[in-house]
Swiss-Prot record:
Substrate binds at residues 69-70, 91, 184. Belongs to the acetylglutamate kinase family. ArgB subfamily. This is Acetylglutamate kinase. Pfam families: AA_kinase. It is found in: Cytoplasm. It is an enzyme of class 2 (transferase). GO terms for cellular component: cytoplasm. Keywords: Amino-acid biosynthesis, Arginine biosynthesis, ATP-binding, Cytoplasm, Kinase, Nucleotide-binding, Transferase. Pathway: Amino-acid biosynthesis; L-arginine biosynthesis; N(2)-acetyl-L-ornithine from L-glutamate: step 2/4. The gene is argB. Its EC number is 2.7.2.8.
Length: 295
């Protein structure tokens, strides 16, 4: 028994030792995490993610969280007798649906995440794109989809003030245009644009897949590291397809604007965030600008 305990303790020390150079590298640096997918629906995984976020904060990393909430929106639309509709992969967002989206993302999902982080020992503050003019939206310009927006501009003053004071900003992807009309914006897009505006060290997208796969049916074909050009070629060849295209595109845009590394990881795995940031092997796909050689 004692031998087993010693082996377990030795393994813990080894893990902490392996994490040290990464902690040193990213201490004081901003990491933007897009939290969504199945990690939001499983209570055990949800609690693990919140503890990981607090851990990042405790070791000096400056986490900024951007979240989605699609399943919760669908659930409330169903309760209210509004049938969810999608067109070209975008949620059709008429006035009634926009009210529900804002109510759910800003009033429920956001506050739950804030409460869970605070319960885990962190100091979280909830925001949406409207707060402090953080995000100014504009319509995507497609007919028949209503108040679906994209990011027109970002003002990170309120986020920087919170981060500099030791708080963890939690941001929902609802923003207003210049007339004050609320728009629903893809959370991956919001995370990428905020990461770029903050000059983040990392953008991490938590998804329901292992990462970028050469063969989407075979998890063993995971591409652990690639650069912008390789990522673009995978899209052109059709290897990156379907719902992965906008995620990879979001990563590429953020890198082109100065983010050092963008990661696509499986949020369903316990401690996925810490495994990706603080271990040599990582667990997902990291996309970097050409020539980037840091940790």
């Amino acid at each position: 028994m004692n031998n087993n305990i010693q082996q377990n303790d030795a393994q813990r020390v080894k893990i902490l030792s392996e994490a040290l150079p990464y902690i040193q590298e990213f201490r004081g640096r901003t990491v933007v995490v897009k939290y969504g997918g199945a990690a939001m629906n499983n209570s055990d995984i949800k609690d693990t993610v919140m503890r990981d976020i607090v851990f990042l904060s405790c070791v000096g990393v400056r986490p900024v969280i951007v979240h989605g909430g699609g399943p919760e929106i669908n659930s409330w639309l169903d309760k209210l007798g509004i049938e969810p509709q999608f067109k070209d992969g975008l949620r059709v967002t008429d006035a009634d649906t926009m009210d529900v989206v804002e109510m759910v993302l800003v009033g429920r999902v956001n506050k739950e995440i804030v409460a869970l982080i605070n319960q885990a020992g962190g100091k979280a503050v909830g925001l949406c794109g409207k707060d402090g003019n953080l995000i100014t939206a504009r319509p995507v310009g497609k007919e028949g989809i209503g108040f679906v927006g994209e990011v027109s501009s970002v003002d990170t003053s309120v986020v920087e003030s919170l981060v500099n004071s030791g708080y963890i900003p939690v941001i929902s992807s609802v923003a207003a245009d210049e007339t004050g009309q609320a728009h629903n914006i893809n959370a991956d897009t919001v995370a990428g644009e905020i990461a770029a505006a903050l000059g983040a060290a990392k953008l991490i997208l938590m998804t329901d897949t292992a990462g970028i796969l050469q063969n989407y049916k075979d998890p063993s074909t995971l591409l652990a590291k690639l650069d912008i050009q390789q990522a673009r070629e995978l899209i052109q060849k059709g290897i990156v397809a379907g719902g992965m295209i906008p995620k990879v595109g979001c990563c590429v845009r953020s890198l082109a604007q100065g983010v050092q590394a963008a990661h696509i990881i499986d949020g369903r795995l316990p401690h996925a965030l810490l495994l990706e940031i603080f271990t040599d092997r990582g667990i997902g796909s990291m996309i970097v600008a050409s020539g980037y050689t840091n940790l």
